[in-house]
Amino acid sequence: MMLSCSPLTVPSSSYPFHFLPSSSDPPYDSIRNHPSLSLLHNCKTLQSLRIIHAQMIKIGLHNTNYALSKLIEFCILSPHFEGLPYAISVFKTIQEPNLLIWNTMFRGHALSSDPVSALKLYVCMISLGLLPNSYTFPFVLKSCAKSKAFKEGQQIHGHVLKLGCDLDLYVHTSLISMYVQNGRLEDAHKVFDKSPHRDVVSYTALIKGYASRGYIENAQKLFDEIPVKDVVSWNAMISGYAETGNYKEALELFKDMMKTNVRPDESTMVTVVSACAQSGSIELGRQVHLWIDDHGFGSNLKIVNALIDLYSKCGELETACGLFERLPYKDVISWNTLIGGYTHMNLYKEALLLFQEMLRSGETPNDVTMLSILPACAHLGAIDIGRWIHVYIDKRLKGVTNASSLRTSLIDMYAKCGDIEAAHQVFNSILHKSLSSWNAMIFGFAMHGRADASFDLFSRMRKIGIQPDDITFVGLLSACSHSGMLDLGRHIFRTMTQDYKMTPKLEHYGCMIDLLGHSGLFKEAEEMINMMEMEPDGVIWCSLLKACKMHGNVELGESFAENLIKIEPENPGSYVLLSNIYASAGRWNEVAKTRALLNDKGMKKVPGCSSIEIDSVVHEFIIGDKFHPRNREIYGMLEEMEVLLEKAGFVPDTSEVLQEMEEEWKEGALRHHSEKLAIAFGLISTKPGTKLTIVKNLRVCRNCHEATKLISKIYKREIIARDRTRFHHFRDGVCSCNDYW
């Protein structure tokens, strides 16, 4: 809003007042020490406040400005309830409020969620002929800063100059902060330069402005000029470095601070511990932790939360859990930090269990909680819990700052849990779609083999003027890769590099090389590797190894495996892939040698693990698993499945199982793969016709793929399986991947 008046000459206000008879205040001491006012100190409810106010009216204190100012001040500062509306109602009854009362009201409005109301009140006051003073301007300027009311702030600056308040340090600092928060750093610096009395507070206000906008050198220059630095100025500079990603510089500055006589406070330690977490400086973090304990900060909740985050991010979850468990009181940030730590370390099941414990504790989750837990639901395929979170978000978290990110996370969760239609519904419900939302939906369709839908979205994006980024093109190339669309993949790669002038990243090359390898174009794939500006990673070499197995190219497979082992010597997957290539070619001696080499190095193949969610509980199975409470029923269903599969003509392909095993044992090894155990459990745990969704940590093998196609037809079930790379939708004996994966 604009102050629709010239400075200090405002039209009469329509602000509604209900006047009480005026009277002069009785002697000051008799009011200040009155028992009724002392009751405010113990007031914790709005009902109690009304009773105290009624008593004040009964004994005549309602006509004294001092008593009313204390009542209004209590209302606006009460930590127990929202008292501003009551303060406004009291204010409207005062016939001639003095400047103290006006300033108290400005303070309340400035602290509220509607700071513009302070500006409206300011217009009202000067229209009544009252002049603001140096106590008025800091609150009104704070409102201009919070509401980004730059024009109004300029006008009030004029009032400051006219009334000669510009020399007041508080007003001076408030002007700097107002300009800073409105992004007017040049104006802020002009105010700073004109001040004959620069104190550490005004320096700090300007330092924060420069640092928050990335002008860290300007901030450092000002910081160096401060003659006597206090803890606030040190904090401003340290947090300035941290917030701009200069964590090492932040920590070096903290070390400099420790050489002075300035004692760090809560804000310092939270910033420093967070900088250690972000930079992975665990050793320095431990030293800081010792200092915290030695100097009496060990029970500070904010600092302990920061320490939990430090140890979580640095992989020391046992220490993080210990800190969490020892907290006498845990706030929502405590819970969020540890849940986020579990998610960060890929301990998704532990994250879900902690989330459920949080709900049982009575703590109310917020948007940050949901952004931490939705990836866990997505990874585990825990769609029932994901749906509950969706309902919670719709009911409790509408309009939060992270609303767009929450919707994008829901799209990702539904897509990764197998319900691509639900993901699409969430996408369509977003009125103002961010690029992240478009990308999440493109990726969702891609992983479900819906390349056509991915490209339809891309066309819609371009029509409405949304520019794709490098992530968009990873999604599109991934869609081509999952569907074997080589020509379209080449076209998209050219579009990205030529039309959008984007430099390909490792992920883009990975998709193209996977496409070329699947198509048997190994020479072209190697040429692309040679033209890359970066070294290929393990994902690229793995995709080529799988392609060699598919096309029976043992010689190239050996070469690619050698490259993979060089960059990932401790990865057993490279030996397993090479062993599979030898097995496909019937070279059993090489299979035995490769497996022996794997054993000699003490490495073990990552076991296949599949999970299925039943009634909001995620059940996990490994190959040959016999530890489930319903183990007997599961294996009974497995036997039934095998009988029906055999009747349907299914014959297991045992060519890739070690030669030394008897044929009967080979078939048994295939029969007990983790995805089959999960399917068997799903069949005995759900009603006929219920859709089953399986999540597997490895690529589904050819035998299980063929068997699952038939199982979907025999039991008349839709079975959705997510393996390491994509989704398979099995229905009526057919898979959505068309046997291309």
From Swiss-Prot:
PROSITE patterns: PPR (PS51375). It is found in: Plastid, Chloroplast. GO terms for biological process: chloroplast RNA processing; mRNA processing; RNA modification. One of its GO terms (cellular component) is chloroplast. Disruption phenotype: No visible phenotype under normal growth conditions. Keywords: Chloroplast, mRNA processing, Plastid, Repeat, Transit peptide. Residues 540-615 are annotated as: Type E motif. One of its GO terms (molecular function) is zinc ion binding. Residues 647-741 are annotated as: Type DYW motif. The keyword Chloroplast applies. Residues 616-646 are annotated as: Type E(+) motif. Pfam families: DYW_deaminase, E_motif, PPR, PPR_1, PPR_2. PPR repeats lie at residues 98-132, 133-167, 168-202, 203-229, 230-264, 265-299, 300-330, 331-365, 366-396, 403-433, 434-468, 469-499, 505-535. Coiled coil: none annotated. Involved in multiple sites RNA editing events in chloroplasts. Involved in the editing of the site 9 of ndhB (ndhB-9) and site 1 of ndhG (ndhG-1) transcripts, which are two plastid-encoded subunits of the chloroplast NAD(P)H dehydrogenase (NDH) complex. Not essential for the activity of the NDH complex of the photosynthetic electron transport chain. Interacts with ORRM1. Interacts with VAR3/OZ1. Belongs to the PPR family. PCMP-H subfamily. The DYW motif is dispensable for editing activity in vivo. This is Pentatricopeptide repeat-containing protein At1g08070, chloroplastic. It comes from Arabidopsis thaliana.
